[in-house]
Amino acid sequence: KKIKTFIYLSSDHYEKKFGYSYKFVDKKFNIISNKTQISKKNKIENFTRDIFALRKKIKAIQPDFIVVLGDRYEMLIGPIISIQQQIPLFHFYGGAVTEGSADELVRHAISKMSHYHFVATNNYKKRLIQLGEEKWRIIVTGVLSLNNIKKEKFLTKKELSNFYNFNFFNPYALLTYHPTTHELQNLRSKIQLILKSIKNKKLNLVVTYPNSDHKHETIIKFIEKNLKNKKGNLLIKNCGYKRYISLVKNSEFMIGNSSSGIVESATLKVPSLNIGSRQKGKIIPKNVVSCKYNEKDILRNIEKVHNKTFKKKLKKLKNPYENNFKISNMPKIILKILKNKNLLKKKFKDF
């Protein structure tokens, strides 16, 4: 049985500085959001507009359930409306810990507002149980997008070179760096330290833009000032899913503090250098090396992730975020969950 799906994209997807990412959503889906929900004033106003816009759409559509994916602050609009309208809320990927990010607080808040949980690992299931969630409300699926990566036909270096007008045949590192809640001091010097360390390796550098967290403008201005239109550097606002994983696949290594440097990189068997505390608390695959903001430490670990012996060891790497869960079973599982008379009657389970 098919489930008709509607997608609401939050305001950030319609912003020029983030590359109008709404354009990368598959056209076969029913997108019910639009750029009229954006305010240029501030994020709080955008958040408020999103709530009103989504509530209006939900009133018209009358959905049987709402799905929230991830832990960005914008995701809170779904749970708020779910509670107010008494619509079942399904949350993907709760139970994780990222101590250095504001997403940490949002993730656990969404978990407590959700009626059913699809989690990445057994450890994350245990954590939700610690939060008082009933066991029957949780299923371990792994990160489902990793199944798509295994089936994906990656873009070649030639195809990427033609698209971006950049020579991908020269070895490059892929940098994604987001603001970290507890590391906002001396932000420019932290980025400068990373850039200097990569430059010492004489590698080309491909940089994707940061997310919309507080102080993202500082990062954007800095990388544009120091890297834009300079030989051997490529800045990308938003490249879409297929191009991004192709960029990862073809890179020498990933560097920065993005979750993709932990989750997706392991499936692609690409070395990754995770810097700082943004991802602290997450399960770390063996292709990932973590270090602090210290020049000697960063340089030493760049040598490690760029080492051929280290790369060879990754051939048999098992990603802890992968699972044998069959995506084709999802509609059947969801329909069964919706029949449970206690779905909306949450209890706090003491243990």
Where in this protein do the model-derived segments appear?
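A nucleotide-sugar donor-handling region in carbohydrate enzymes
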Residues: 14-17, 113-189
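A donor-sugar binding/catalytic signature common to diverse glycosyltransferases
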Residues: 68-69, 76-80, 91-92, 117, ...
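Active-site and donor-binding regions of nucleotide-sugar-utilizing enzymes
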Residues: 2, 14, 22-24, 35-135, ...
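Catalytic donor nucleotide-activated moiety binding site of glycosyltransferases and closely related
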Residues: 200-238
